[in-house]
Regions:
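Alpha-helix boundary/capping segments in eukaryotic regulatory proteins
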Residues: 92-93, 110
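Histidine-centered, transition-metal-coordinating active-site segments
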Residues: 1-79, 83-89, 96-97, 130-347
Length: 347
């Protein structure tokens, strides 16, 4: 008996009837022989962890540029926090932890350098538009492994595509945005829980806001600390979802109200704060200038990207290249292309 089969039987005996069982996966983009040790979602998680795109997340901005301090979140630490929150919720609800972890670790692989500044400018100047969730799916489907992709399961791919979007609904009930699995719903709400709390934590550290600026009723409801905020939201998701099992992942109207109020506060006082917005505009220009330059100088683009030829339309290849950059790589490339180097006088 294969170890994978033993683990799949364990899932059948221990997971909720609402959980996505590995044995019942909808399959992969391309058929392949499955691992005899790891169930499919665990295999997907491992592929994501070992991908180059995952490693690059450590040098991509969450909200505050990493050079400002060692304790600010990066896109990688955000991803790990989402995975931890999602696994806590999944374990309590007897859902598939391997699946929530795989989706969590892959959900931001397509994020641009400089956080949402990079996403906004690429969406504005690329004719087909740009969304980081769609780019994350493109990373795992096409760009990794030199163009062959990671060949992930449909459930992980769906969860990556349908994770939270900006000021969208906290919990999606119906419609095209609702994920295929409960596990993907868990990741969606865990993503929101993570950034609602840690972006406030980082904003206080960066002196963009003070603890006294947080609305009093939000402090009373969530608690005064980072850990209390997370605990309140996680407990709210778990207990409401247990109560309304048939409906999917749920939160109370009261929790939804305060989560949205906290999110509105973040947008108004942090993301759009003068200090943050000033950096945003500078990063916007870096991405815009690189895109425009490469569009006009295709030979230079191929040289910098290490390509012999375009593998897709020119604009698409340029977007893939820029979206995959880390903050520091984008800085260095901008400096290399646009800033004059000092004269070197031989002695």
């Amino acid at each position: 008996v294969k170890i994978r089969q033993i683990l799949e039987e364990k899932e059948e005996n221990t997971l909720s009837r609402y959980a996505q069982k590995s044995r019942l996966t909808r399959g992969r983009l391309r058929e392949e022989e499955e691992c005899d040790i790891r169930p499919c979602f665990q295999h997907d998680r491992d592929r994501i962890i070992h991908s180059k795109a995952f490693r690059r997340l450590k040098h991509k901005t969450q909200v505050f540029l990493a050079p400002q301090g060692d304790h600010y979140r990066t896109r990688l630490t955000h991803t790990l926090e989402v995975a931890q929150i999602a696994r806590t919720i999944a374990k309590a609800l007897a859902l598939n932890e391997d699946l929530v972890e795989a989706i969590s670790l892959g959900h931001d692989l397509g994020h641009t350098p400089f956080g949402h500044a990079g996403e906004e400018v690429l969406n504005a100047i690329y004719p087909s538009g740009f969304r980081h969730n769609e780019q994350s799916l493109r990373v795992v489907d096409v760009l990794e492994r030199d163009g062959s992709g990671l060949n992930l399961t449909m459930e992980v791919r769906d969860g990556i595509l349908r994770h939270s979007k900006g000021r969208g609904e906290i919990v999606v009930r119906d419609g095209e945005e609702r994920p295929l699995t409960r596990e993907a719903e868990v990741v969606r709400v865990s993503d929101i829980i993570a950034y609602l709390s840690h972006d406030i934590d980082d904003a206080i550290r960066g002196q963009v806001i003070s603890p006294k600026d947080i609305p009093d009723d939000c402090v009373r409801f969530f608690g005064p600390t980072h850990s209390k905020r997370i605990d309140t939201m996680v407990r709210g998701v778990i207990f409401e979802s247990l109560r309304d099992g048939e409906l999917g992942i749920s939160i109370s109207e009261e929790l939804e109200y305060y989560m949205k109020k906290l999110r509105d506060f973040l947008y108004e006082r942090v993301y759009e704060a003068p200090l943050v917005h000033d950096v945003f505009l500078k990063c916007y220009k870096i991405i815009e200038d690189l895109y425009t330059y490469f569009l006009k100088n295709p030979a230079r683009f191929l040289e910098e990207a290490g390509l012999e030829d375009f593998y897709d339309e020119r604009e698409r290849c340029i977007v893939d290249f820029i979206a995959g950059m880390t903050d520091r790589y984008a800085f260095k490339l901008y400096e290399k292309i646009f800033l004059p180097l000092p004269w070197r006088i031989p002695f």
